[in-house]
Amino acid sequence: MAELNFSLVIFTLLIGLCTGTFLIYGLGRLRNNSALAAVEKSSLLLMVVLLICLGVALLASATHLGKPFRFMNAFHNPGSMIAQEGLWSMALGVTLLIAALMAFKGKIIPKGLYPVGSLVSCGLLLVCSMVYVKAVGFPAWSSGVTIIYYFGSAILLGAAVVFLFSMLHGEEGTEKNLAFTALTAVFLQMIVSVAFFVHLKFGVMDVTLPTTLGMDLLRWGIGLIAPAVIAYLTWSGKLKGKSVAWSFLACVLVGEAISRVIFFMQGIHL
């Protein structure tokens, strides 16, 4: 069985949360989404939360190498995947910091910053997923499905965070809009999860992968089916209140954490 490194679970989970949240929130603001307009007043809190999560993610990335100074040494080779992760993460950090400073000064975050941050977020997600796609001798990861998996996970995590902020700080009656976005994100990740399962089942022939049926069922129940039910009932008007969004986010976080544990358990070397 592959060695499970929980630092990488934390790193990939928080990177997905940061990038996905900026993508969902930024694209919504560019489209003048009325459900997110009222959330603009809490943009400072949102950007600070994302900055903290990004900082924790980078610390986790540094510790997974065993000796944190190796993370800094990697920048001597800017073309290395670790250096690329660090550079793209810093670019996202600068974007979040600019947005936070403008919000702190009481200014509206310029819309031009959202496409820039969205491109940086996509770049960071691509680099983080390519680390595993390009890893030599790991059949379970060396597929384009890995890239789609990382993007789908980020979108789901981002939708959960934005859904929460809309419920906490948005105007009454706007929850249905974001609930539909959250529901769409869940179904997208369901499709991606099935695609990844098919890849593991029929596309990996050279190694024997560990059985993770119990964890898969747990992940689907907590991380996909439960959020789908919550989002649907909110969208249909049968559920209301801030606790709904907190429950949705909690289920998604637990589900995606389990998903990453499963992902790394499949990292069997040839």
Language-model features, listed with the residues they occupy:
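Membrane helical hairpin/interfacial module
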Residues: L17, T21-G28, N33-L92
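Hydrophobic transmembrane helix segments
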Residues: A60-P68, F196-F202, F264
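Hydrophobic transmembrane alpha-helical segments in integral membrane proteins
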Residues: M1-T19, Y149
